[in-house]
Amino acid sequence: RRQLPLSGRSPQISIMMGKSAGGAVYAPVTTDFVIAVDEEAEMYVTGPNVIREVTGEDITSAELGGARQQELNGNVSAVVPSEDDAFDMVRDLLDHLPLTCFDESPEFAAPSDAEVAEDEDLNAFMPDDTNAGYDMMDLLTQLGDDEDLIEIQENFAPNMITAFGRIDGKTVGFVANNPM
C-alpha cells in the first residue's frame, strides 16, 4: 500500500534472496529494479506442485521461477552470485540515481583533460573490416569516466545493452545494440 504512491518518485529496488510465491511476488516486480541472488531467489505466482497437479508437467521450482529464468523473462534486473553482491549492486545503483524525481542525479569528479587526451583506445575501436563484429560493451566502457558500468537485464535481450555509467561526472544511461 505504501509502495505504489512512491513509484516514479524515488528509486525502488528489491533484493530477492529466497523463495517468494503467490501474491508476495507482486511487490518486487513493481519496483524499478529487482536484484536476485543466483541459486537462492525464486518467484512464481503458482508453484511447481500446482503446475504438476493441473497440467501434469514435472518442473522444478528453479526451472519455473529461479533467478536465471526470471531474468530471461524480464522480471529480474540482475542476477548476482551472493547476498553481498546484491547489496553492493544496490549501493552502486543508488550512487547513480537521484534520491527523488525532484533531485538531480549525483555528480562525481570528471577525469582530467590530460587523462582524456592520452586515451587513444577510441581511435582504434572500430575494426577496419565492416563485416567484423565488435563488442559494444567495450565502447561504452571507453566512453564512460571509469570502467564501472552497471548493466541491467543483461540476459533478457542479449543483443541489447542497457546500462548506467558516467560521462564527465554526470550519470548517463546507455541503450545500445550489441552486434556480437
Name every feature range the model reports, one short phrase each.
Residues P5-G8, E115, I167:
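A generic structural signal for short, non-catalytic loop/turn and secondary-structure boundary residues
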Residues R1-F102:
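Conserved catalytic cores of soluble enzyme domains
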Residues S10-I13, G23, L97-E104, D129, ...:
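Short secondary-structure junctions and interdomain/linker hinges
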Residues A78, S82-L140:
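Terminal amphipathic helices with adjacent charged low-complexity linkers/tails
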Residues M17-K19, F33, S61-A62, F108, ...:
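Short secondary-structure boundary micro-motifs
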Residues R1-R2, A36, E42-V45, M126-A132, ...:
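Generic detector of short, locally flexible boundary/turn motifs and exposed helical patches
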Residues N131-M180:
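Non-catalytic terminal/interface segments that mediate subunit docking, oligomerization
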Residues G47-P48, A67-G74, A114-N123, G173-A176:
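Short acidic (Asp/Glu) and glycine-rich catalytic loops that position anionic groups and cofactors
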